[in-house]
């Protein structure tokens, strides 16, 4: 797994580096909805295949509340199946340490991340050559750190100066994204050099997107549930796949069961069922039904820190989205097909889809645990 922290899907679509990342055997998912528009809950949902409202990791504050007694992660499954597991992350809050053989916390501002990740790839190569199966998570946080230093430390979610300078915001982000592309290009070269493509599943993805000032009230990510931060990308490589782009809506929680099916590993029925489903019916053009995608986050509003429980939530299909703002008891309904910028709120206009989405929203709330 190679995470590009804060990578926007629109930039990924237009990136020759990402689009050509072993393109002939890669499937590009261009509408993958994250459970949370911030890293720790997003990644916990990815590796467990379950939403944080059920696992316990539903806010910035609750990484340690992830319920390992009821939910297994992909790392747990792989460790049980004799994979050597290794991760490199910017903080130990974004990924549980359980069942990792090696777990590194790296500050990108103080080390050469490319060199460090190359060293890890070399270590994995030695294991592979000795017939040891491996799992490696690499985390590129350059975009996040750049936005942290130039946006989060300088502006608030209500700074007019930020929202009135969209061009500057775009240029700032694009410079950071270009650096991420250079990192990926380097990793691609090293995977070639080490011959690590064969018999591998390699996924390049973003945990969440990034606001560039599209919606007042969110200067980066983690406050709202609009497309700029919750719509992400996944590029899924395996030599037994043929290239295609899948534009249908999928969810980040779908990739854990997809990987397990690909590896022939069965789900453990002694644990809670997943929210995610395998994407192979979709990959194999079997026209499966579309699943609702759920996202939630904690809008800090006027506070300098996020709340300890989510207060902004959304439920959606590929064409419609219902946003529930619990902090002020309001709702928003958007026709994503005809209003992709989410500018025309259709709530309380008598549309049947509103009640359908609301019923699904309530079903998900009933499953929530209380931290």
Residue spans of the language-model regions?
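Catalytic domains that recognize anionic headgroups
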Residues: 1-371
């Amino acid at each position: 797994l190679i995470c590009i922290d804060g990578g926007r899907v629109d930039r990924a679509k237009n990136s020759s580096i990402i689009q050509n990342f072993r393109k002939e055997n890669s499937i590009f998912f261009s509408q993958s909805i994250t459970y949370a528009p911030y890293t720790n809950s997003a990644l916990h949902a990815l590796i467990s295949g379950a939403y944080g409202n059920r696992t316990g990791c539903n806010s910035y504050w609750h990484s340690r509340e992830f319920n390992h007694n009821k939910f297994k992660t992909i790392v747990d499954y792989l460790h049980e199946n004799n994979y050597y597991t290794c991760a490199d992350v910017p903080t130990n809050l974004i990924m549980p340490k359980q069942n990792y053989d090696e777990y590194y916390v790296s500050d990108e501002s103080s080390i050469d991340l490319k060199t460090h990740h190359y060293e890890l790839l070399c270590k994995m190569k030695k294991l592979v050559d000795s017939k040891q199966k491996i799992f490696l998570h690499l985390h590129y946080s350059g975009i996040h750190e750049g936005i942290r230093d130039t946006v989060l430390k300088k502006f608030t979610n209500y700074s007019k100066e930020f929202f009135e300078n969209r061009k500057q915001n775009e240029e700032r982000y694009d410079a950071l994204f270009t650096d991420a592309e250079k990192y990926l290009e380097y990793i691609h070269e090293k995977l070639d050099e080490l011959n690590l493509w064969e018999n591998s599943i390699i996924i390049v993805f973003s945990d969440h997107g990034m606001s560039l000032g599209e919606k007042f009230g969110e200067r980066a990510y983690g406050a709202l549930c609009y497309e700029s931060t919750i719509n992400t990308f996944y590029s899924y490589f395996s030599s037994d796949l043929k290239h295609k782009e899948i534009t249908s809506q999928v969810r980040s929680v779908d990739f854990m069961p997809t990987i397990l099916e690909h590896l022939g590993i069965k789900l453990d029925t002694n644990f809670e069922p997943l929210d995610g489903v395998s994407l192979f019916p979709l990959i194999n053009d079997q026209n499966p039904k579309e699943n609702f995608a759920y996202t939630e986050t904690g809008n800090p509003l006027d506070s300098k820190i996020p709340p300890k429980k989510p207060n902004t939530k959304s439920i959606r299909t590929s064409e419609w989205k219902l946003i529930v703002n619990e902090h002020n008891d309001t709702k928003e309904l958007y026709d994503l097909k005809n209003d992709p910028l989410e500018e025309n709120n259709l709530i309380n206009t008598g549309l049947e889809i509103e009640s359908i989405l609301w019923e699904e929203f309530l079903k998900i709330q009933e499953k929530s645990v209380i931290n």
